[in-house]
Each structure stands twice: as C-alpha cells, then as structure tokens.
C-alpha cells in the first residue's frame, strides 16, 4: 500500500460515517477569516458566509465543505475520499456539485472566480500539482495550510512557508494558533490565478 492510499484510508476512518461533523465545522468557521472570508451572523445563525454569486471550487472540501455555510454561491467540491453516498446527495440538494476525483486530475482552465484550499495539501498525492491546477482553475486562490508539522500516517507531506510561496508565486502570512480546534503554525493568504485579469474586475 503506497503512502497516499494509506493516508486516504486513514482519512476515511477519521471521518467515520460523517454523521457528526460539528467540531470540524467549528474549526472551519474559525479558519475562514484567514482565507479572507467574512462571517456575517443573522437572526438564524452565527455561522454564515454571504457571497455575491461567485463560482467557487473547493479542493479537498470533504463531506462538510465551507461552501455549505455560504449563501449565494455556485459551488464545486472535488475530493477523492470514499464518503457515504448521502454526502453527495446533500451537496446536490444544496446546489453544490460534488466530484469524487483527485485534485491532481482536474482539468479546469480559468473556470472559477475563486479556488479554496484549506487543511488539505498534507493529505494529497502531489501537492505541487494541486497548486498548479488551482492557479489554472481560478482568478484567485484562498489558502490556509499547516506548515512545519512533520509527516505521519494520515499526513504524508509537510511544508514550509517558502515552499508554498514559491509554488503560489506570491507572499503569504504565517500565524501561530492555539485554540478553537486550530493548533500549530498556519500559512494563509489570497493569491492571483495564472490568468487573472485586473481589467475584467472593473
């Protein structure tokens, strides 16, 4: 069994039957501001991210993507892990397309307004390829990834700030976190995609 297959099995076992994802959802909302996303509570929930109709690709979004907490979004989740069938059905019911494929196998070319990558690169087979595909797929890339964590059975990769900046072609920020389910050094930032055109935003 190669390291990636072993890591996928670990990930599937970690999620179990996916019925109770509350703690993961809380962690997501705590990291959302580091992606540059604004949480705007209303009378119904404190966990709400209003968007403006953007088309967003979430790479490795898992069974409970941040897109499920967003309003007014055209979402696509790409994740190869073997989750229960109802995970895809829930995404469909919420108007989110779910593709059980590897991020390395994506072939998108400037099809998205935004690409989101959060807490995923340490799990994948070829992290640099994921970044390359993300830069081709969207106008901007929002990223939050742990750095300097070492490798383990479920996390076959570890990264440095310099490594991620080189792949992304820009400067990010590093913060040390110790609460709300977020522990360790994290790299985060918003980066321009390969075909970003500032004139198109005017």
Regions found by a protein language model. Give the residues of each.
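A conserved beta-strand element that flanks and buttresses the S-adenosyl-L-methionine
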Residues: 116
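Short catalytic micro-motifs in class I SAM-dependent methyltransferases
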Residues: 119-120
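Class I SAM-dependent methyltransferase Rossmann-like catalytic core
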Residues: 1-50
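Conserved class I S-adenosyl-L-methionine
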Residues: 53-62
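Conserved beta-strand signature within the Rossmann-like core of class I S-adenosyl-L-methionine
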Residues: 138-148
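A short, conserved alpha-helix within the catalytic core of class I
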Residues: 123-134
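Short alpha-helix
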Residues: 155-180
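Class I SAM-dependent methyltransferase SAM/SAH-binding core
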Residues: 61-105
């Amino acid at each position: 069994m190669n390291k990636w297959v072993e890591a996928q099995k670990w990930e599937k076992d970690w999620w179990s039957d996916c019925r109770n994802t509350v703690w993961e959802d809380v962690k997501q909302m705590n990291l959302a501001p580091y992606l540059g996303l604004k949480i705007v509570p209303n009378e119904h929930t404190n966990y709400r991210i209003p968007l403006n109709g953007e088309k967003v690709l979430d790479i490795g979004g898992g069974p409970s993507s941040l897109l499920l907490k967003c309003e007014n979004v055209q979402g696509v989740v790409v994740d190869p892990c073997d989750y229960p069938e109802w995970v895809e059905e829930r995404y469909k019911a919420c108007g989110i397309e779910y593709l059980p494929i590897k991020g390395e196998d994506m072939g998108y070319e400037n099809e998205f307004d935004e690409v989101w990558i959060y807490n995923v690169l340490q799990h994948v087979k070829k992290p640099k390829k994921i970044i390359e595909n993300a830069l081709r797929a969207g106008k901007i890339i929002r990223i939050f990834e742990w750095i300097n964590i070492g490798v383990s059975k479920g996390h076959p990769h570890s990264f440095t700030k310099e490594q991620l900046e080189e792949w992304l072609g820009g400067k990010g920020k590093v913060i040390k976190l110790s609460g709300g389910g977020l522990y360790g050094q994290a790299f985060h930032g918003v980066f321009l995609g390969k075909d970003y055109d500032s004139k198109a935003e005017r």
